[in-house]
Structures are given as structure tokens and as C-alpha cells.
Amino acid sequence: MPQRHTTSELFLVLVASLCCLVVGARADSAKGPSASQARKALTRIKQLELKSSAVRVKSVTSTGASTADVATDLRLVFKFQTGAEGRWGVSEVRTGQDRWEGIDLIAEALHANIAADCNAPDPPLKGKLAVDPSVRRARCLLGSLFGIDVPSDSVRIQEVDPMPVPLASQPSATVVAWIRVDARMTNAQGGWEVTEIRTGNRDWIRLDSVTAALDDQKRRRAREELDLIATALEKFRSERGFYVVADKQAVAIDYLSPRYLQRVIRVDPWHQPYGYLGERDRFTLRSSGPDGKPDTTDDILVSSR
């Protein structure tokens, strides 16, 4: 005859099964994200649009039931440029399709010193065509930027592509490099997400605080650029007797540059076109601010005097 179980025995079996499920779930959570989950989280960093092919997860270390540290190599693209003294420096990093962020803005937001002495003469090459900047110089500059002592596998140069631009005042180049980045992740309701990052001997930095600090610097930069355009419009009016009449900032810039405005300024630090509405006796200049939407509370406005 089949063995019969009492109600109490069945209850104990059920409780034991549930306990096993809970323990198993906690054990899986304690393992941290898988490599694919970590890669997905890194590609979701809103400040830096990365493809999966640009992320190589090296290791995952669980630091708690819902936290983990991930070591990864990221393929990043930089613009290098020479300064007034002919010294090479890192000027921009690509943060998305046709979108670049100025290194100076990032450094100001993080209160970081990006000065680097990487301009010693390169040794002569044998059997190879020299490129400028050299791989050695590019590695030195990026190592200094990220707090990494070079030579190191934490900075590996994939490509140096000089960019000859006709009539350009300063030589420039595009550099593709793999940079070792430590990422701190948290398992939130929507899945694993990156909350902090660190490179080389730098301290951990929170991504949300970086975004806020960077937006503050961009507001300051936008205000400075709008003031420059406004000053140019006042000069235009003092000579012509009226402001530029237009509803597009690009039209106003075409009238102002180069006689009244030496720099051609068309987009704000958030990569959105500046707004302009001008009549003969008044004008309004506008940046849509961090949200990129006009007529919201974060707009930056400069009007005629």
C-alpha cells in the first residue's frame, strides 16, 4: 500500500521546499551579475553610449546580496589636439553617435588636474612610418588622464588616426583605446545598474554626482556663450540701428560672424541648437538646458538690454 503522509508532514515538506527556494535565490543573487548582465549594465550608462562590442568584462566580484564590483575594459574614442605651444593633449571623448564631450568640462566638474608632461621626443622608429601623436605619447596622455601608471595593460591603444583638416589652426587626431574601468553595480528593480566607477589610482565617483556637476559646468558655459552672442548683437545694433531680425539662431550667427563674433557658436553644451528670436528692437537667446526641451524651468535665457 502507498505510504500516507499526515497533514503535518506535508506541511513540513512544503516549508522545507520553500526554504530551499529562498536559499537558492539568495545564493544566485550573492553571485552577482553574470558577464552578460554586467555588459548590459555598462552599455546602459546614459552618460556614455557603448555598444556590446566595446565592453569586455574581465571579472565580477560579489560584494553583497545586491552589489558587485566589475572589472572591465572599455573601448573609448578620443580627440587629441595640439595647443598653442604645439603640445598634444586630450580634448574630447566620444559619448554617443556624433556626440562628443569636452575633457575640460569633465575635469572642471570633477575638480581634476588633466595636465600631463608627455611631450618628450619619441625615439626613432625602424621600418615603420611615424605618426603624430605616437602610440607612446597617446598612451602617456590617456594614462595621466585616468590615473594609470603606464606602460600598463590598463591602457591599450588600438588606433591613432591623424585628422588632416584643411585650413585647421591646430593639428588633431582620433585615438581609439581600451581603458580598464572598475564599475560598482547595484541590483535594482529594473536589473543591474552601474552606480560608481573608478580608473587607475583615482577615487570612486558616483555617476549621478558626475552628471549633476557636469550640468553645472555646462550651465556656466552656456551662459558665457549666450553673453558673447548678446554682446555681438549689441555691437551689430550700434552700427546698424537694429538687431538681427530672425527666428533662428543660425541666421543670427551668419550675420554676426566674423565681424561682430569671432567664434561660430551654434549649439549649446548639451549639443542642442541655441534658440533665437529677434526683432528690430529686442531679442531673446535661449538654451534648452539639460532636458533639451524649450520653455521648461531649466532653460537659460539672455535678453536684450
Residue ranges, per PLM feature:
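Asp-box/BNR beta-propeller loop motif
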Residues: 84-87, 189-191
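Surface-exposed, charged secondary-structure patches
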Residues: 28-29, 40-77, 93-109, 133-180
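Short beta-strand element of the conserved SAM-dependent methyltransferase core
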Residues: 60, 78-81, 185, 276
